Amino acid sequence: MKTIEVDDELYHYIASRTQAIGESASDILRRLLRLPSSPQPFVLVQPNIAEELNASTKSTNQAKKQTNIEKTVQKFERVLKSDTFVNETKNVRRFLMLLSALHISDQQGFANATAVVTGTERTYFATNEDMLLRCGNGVKAKKIPDSPFWVVTNNSTARKGLILTAVMQSMQMPSHLIDRVRVLFA
């Protein structure tokens, strides 16, 4: 609370506007000036400074997002270049390795992507096998290594590629990597 001095005439005017016993001078003035009942923080910011602050915040957030994507790309490329991946002949295992790499590199992004990527009549991802098995007869589900997710694996090689590229697009992976995966599962 701050103390201010007012002349007698103003004091009597404010006092005459009292509506309830115990109402403070601040409450009366707020009501008379049509201000909110609770004090609001007041900061004087010049418009161009506010715009600069907003721009710097946006650029910082974009830089962090870009750094996370770069880390994801590096981890994913490491898997693509690894001897284990290159020498693997079974597409199902390659499919699972790449999904695992995506999950390890960006768990939240992967979780968001799996929630979005679905087929017209089939769910491709779930957090347990039973959820996938309920989606239809003949569904083969496998656990994605090092993740809590399961994926349907009895799809054609081309469909596996579509699933992978859809997840990668949802995770905002660069188009050159998406194209590279598309070629692997063509």
From Swiss-Prot:
Keywords assigned by UniProt, alphabetized: Cytoplasm, DNA replication inhibitor, DNA-binding
Compartments (UniProt record): Cytoplasm
GO biological process, one term: regulation of DNA-templated transcription
A Pfam family: SeqA
Highest taxon of source: Bacteria
Main location per the UniProt record: cytoplasm
SUPFAM superfamilies: Replication modulator SeqA, C-terminal DNA-binding domain, Ribbon-helix-helix
GO MF annotation list: DNA binding
Subunit description: Homodimer. Polymerizes to form helical filaments.
Protein role: Negative regulator of replication initiation, which contributes to regulation of DNA replication and ensures that replication initiation occurs exactly once per chromosome per cell cycle. Binds to pairs of hemimethylated GATC sequences in the oriC region, thus preventing assembly of replication proteins and re-initiation at newly replicated origins. Repression is relieved when the region becomes fully methylated.
Family, as annotated: Belongs to the SeqA family.
Protein name: Negative modulator of initiation of replication
Organism whose genome encodes this protein: Haemophilus ducreyi (strain 35000HP / ATCC 700724)
Gene: seqA
